[in-house]
């Protein structure tokens, strides 16, 4: 996959365009993010439609990209902003405007069609910032 194509996936993701999953994920894709695991395009769509996008604005930034043709490795910075007060989210209770910041490395394995068949997420940091501006390192959130 060319870097420009990968960055188009990120652009569409940032727009909450879940049809990007149809275009970029293999039908049997496997995702591992800490202790959270799910499979397939439907698993990815469910995760974002139910667990993330109703509760958070999520924006991805990719400052570094490398590829050997069958794997893509990136440095990922992700910023989550709580849309509203909520007692139940994937990260626990949140208040509107509170943020979570992920800094990590993600490895994508590509199938023969150039689609993501395996995605592995590794954490450097996951920081919660309260409505009062207090920052707390959460380690791996799930």
Model region roles, listed by residue range:
Residues 1-142:
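C-terminal and inter-domain tail/linker signature
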């Amino acid at each position: 996959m060319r870097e420009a194509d990968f960055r188009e996936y990120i652009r569409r993701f940032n727009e909450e365009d879940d049809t990007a999953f149809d275009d970029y994920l293999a039908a049997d894709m496997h995702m591992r993010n800490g202790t959270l695991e799910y499979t397939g395009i439907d698993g990815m769509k469910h995760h974002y439609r139910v667990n993330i996008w109703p509760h958070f604005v999520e924006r991805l930034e990719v400052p570094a990209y490398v590829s050997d043709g069958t794997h893509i490795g990136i440095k990922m910075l992700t910023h989550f902003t709580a849309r509203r007060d909520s007692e139940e989210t994937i990260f626990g209770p949140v208040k509107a405007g509170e943020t979570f910041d992920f800094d990590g490395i993600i490895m994508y394995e590509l199938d023969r069609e150039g689609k993501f068949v395996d995605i592995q997420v590794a954490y450097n940091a996951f920081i919660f910032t309260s409505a009062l501006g207090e920052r707390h390192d959460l380690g791996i959130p799930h």
